[in-house]
Curated annotation (Swiss-Prot):
<comment type="function">
    <text>Catalyzes the final step of sucrose synthesis.</text>
</comment>
<comment type="similarity">
    <text>Belongs to the sucrose phosphatase family.</text>
</comment>
<dbReference type="GO" id="GO:0050307">
    <property type="term" value="F:sucrose-phosphate phosphatase activity"/>
</dbReference>
<comment type="pathway">
    <text>Glycan biosynthesis; sucrose biosynthesis; sucrose from D-fructose 6-phosphate and UDP-alpha-D-glucose: step 2/2.</text>
</comment>
<comment type="subunit">
    <text>Homodimer.</text>
</comment>
<dbReference type="InterPro" id="IPR013679">
    <property type="entry name" value="SPP_C"/>
</dbReference>
<keyword id="KW-0378">Hydrolase</keyword>
<dbReference type="InterPro" id="IPR023214">
    <property type="entry name" value="HAD_sf"/>
</dbReference>
<dbReference type="GO" id="GO:0005986">
    <property type="term" value="P:sucrose biosynthetic process"/>
</dbReference>
<dbReference type="InterPro" id="IPR036412">
    <property type="entry name" value="HAD-like_sf"/>
</dbReference>
<protein>
    <recommendedName>
        <fullName>Probable sucrose-phosphatase 1</fullName>
        <ecNumber>3.1.3.24</ecNumber>
    </recommendedName>
</protein>
<keyword id="KW-0460">Magnesium</keyword>
<dbReference type="InterPro" id="IPR006379">
    <property type="entry name" value="HAD-SF_hydro_IIB"/>
</dbReference>
<dbReference type="Pfam" id="PF08472">
    <property type="entry name" value="S6PP_C"/>
</dbReference>
<dbReference type="InterPro" id="IPR051518">
    <property type="entry name" value="Sucrose_Phosphatase"/>
</dbReference>
<dbReference type="Pfam" id="PF05116">
    <property type="entry name" value="S6PP"/>
</dbReference>
<dbReference type="InterPro" id="IPR006380">
    <property type="entry name" value="SPP-like_dom"/>
</dbReference>
Amino acid sequence: MDKLSGSARLIIVSDLDHTMVDHHDEENLSLLRFGALWESVYCQDSLLVFSTGRSPTLYKELRKEKPMLTPDITIMSVGTEITYGEAMVPDDGWEEYLNNKWDRNVVVEETAKFSELKLQPETEQRPHKVSFFVDKKSAQEVIKSLSGNMEKCGLDVKIIYSGGQDLDILPQGAGKGQALAYLLKKLSSCGKPPNNTLVCGDSGNDAELFSIPGVHGVMVSNAQEELLQWYAENAKGNPKIIHATERCAAGIIEAIGHFKLGPSVSPRDVGFPYVKEDHIKPTDAVVKFYVLYEKWRRAEVPKSDSVVQYFKNITHANGVIIQPSGLECSLHASVDALSSCYGEKQGKKYRTWVDRLFVSQSGSDSWLVRFDLWEAEGDARLCCLTSLALNVKPETPAGFLITHVHKTWLKGYSSADEQSSKL
């Protein structure tokens, strides 16, 4: 949260499975479309929050499988854990707050009396969360009995049933909604209340998010019956909550446009040739650069000299690129080499995307842009920590020039093949 000097233009708080991440989309197109939009338009003045029922272990596994962005804040284990930044620094104040009227040992003892409850894997058992699988037919009766037993034991707990099988027992003060309320209060106390907040979900454990006063909300088109039922009973007619017509991350993009929260056209949906912008945004320039690079290698743009010429127009004739090995090459020579790799990834599950994009102004018309540049093909992943120097030049065809690129392998994601890191 410290990255912003003032109020966030927009906070997006999204569930992951079947909301931000579409497990039926093998190409991850909607997730990549959202990622390109966020890094292009919002990453410098807004906050991205992932709110998931997953434990830290399963959350990290998902990040290795899908082309997800690095969020500013991560809420995990159904709102019982809050962490900040890439390092996932825990919020100790939140953990201390959840200890009120909570005794995990008593919860375990009481739930052991119900044969209908099957413990979830050990990774999903957390300090402030005990999780089970339970058959849909038995769920409501078990919840009613459990609630009474916990009250008799002097505990104040919350029981959440979602996904038609998952039953989570948490402290009463926990949950996705309370975690978000805590964060919004924290931002307000620092004098940084967000201009707008958009919450996004698909299942029962997301319902609390939509109850926070003042937020906009989107139930993605594939939302489950339990969330739609909650909406019908509690929020029908609320103009700030919509049921999207698009699935998952595409539904989130739809909501940004519907509520007029900001630009809602992803760079991945912009055709080539690009229209010259009146005001150059370094973030937008970088994202579009690598989207076009991917489309060229996948043969999703025509094999035209105009594409190669565009890359030359936006790179300085004397500019250099330093590859991860330390090899220094001419930017224009690297662009020329693109001609030979047109369509080499056609029909393959090849994608490239940028993450953790950070911009600093180095002069009146010059910028230093730092980001993680990811490339994936099937299950194989590569990542370069990339620095790019960019000058705004209104008189040039594109309005800007890239003068220098420096790439270093991210530990654990390197390749011996320097060709894997052409631009």
